[in-house]
Amino acid sequence: MRVLVVEDEKPLADAVARGLRRDGMAVDVAYDGESGQEKTSITRYDVVVLDRDLPAMSGDELCRELMTSGELTRVIMLTASDAVEDRVEGLSLGADDYLVKPFAFPELIARVRALGRRATPAQPPLLTAQDLELDPAKRIVRRSGGEVELTRKELGVLEVLLAAGGAVISSEELLERVWDENADPFTTTVRVTMMSLRKKLGEPGIIETVVGAGYRVPSAAAERVRD
C-alpha cells in the first residue's frame, strides 16, 4: 500500500511515517500543502494522511483537489480540534475518515488499512498459487499448510504478483508499489528481495522471471479464492 503523510509538525510526520513503514506500507512525507499537492500529482497514493492546518496550502484545499481528481485515493484527516462541527466540515470536504490528535497509533494504522482496502478493487479473502496461500488481511503466508515467515517487503512483493492475475510486473513497478520515494531505482533492491523470497517459498518455484520485462506468477498457478 502506498501512503502519503502530509503534516507540518516534522517530528509527528516522521513518527507516523516510521510507524506505517514498520507495518509494511510504502510511505512518502510532505511537510506542507504545496509539497503534498506536488507529490499527489506525480504519484498515485492509496491513502493520504492529511493534517488540516498546513502552511502554503491548507489541508482543506488539498482535500478538495484530491476529491475532484478522479483518483480512488482515500483521505484521513488529522486535526487537534474535536468539535463536532469541525469533524462534520472535514468529512463534507470529501475526507473518508477523521482522527483527532492526540491519537492511539494502532488506531491510525487500522484506519489507514481499512481505507486502503476501499481504495483498491475488492479482493478475495485469499490469494493463492499452487499450494501457497496469502491472506491480505492477516498478512500471513502459508505453503502446504505451514506458515512461511517473510519480511514486510517480501510479503508486499508476493501480494502484488499474486494480485496481478498472471500479468508481468516490472522491477520499477514493484519498487514504486512496495517501497517509497527514497528507494534508489538503480540499486539491486528488487532482485535481492526476489532471491530471498524465492528461497523462502521453496520448490516448485512459483515466481517466473520474464527477461527484460519483470516478474509474474503464471495465471495457471495464481488464482483468487473466495469463501
Summary of predicted features, one role per range:
Residues 140, 145-205, 211-213, 219:
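Positively charged, aromatic-enriched patches within helix-turn-helix-type DNA-binding elements
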Residues 1-119:
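N-terminal/domain-start alpha-helical segments
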Residues 128-140, 199, 213, 221-227:
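Short boundary/linker motifs that mark transitions into or out of structured domains
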Residues 96, 213-214:
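Short acidic-rich active-site patches of cyclic nucleotide enzymes
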Residues 113-126, 166:
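The C-terminal output helix
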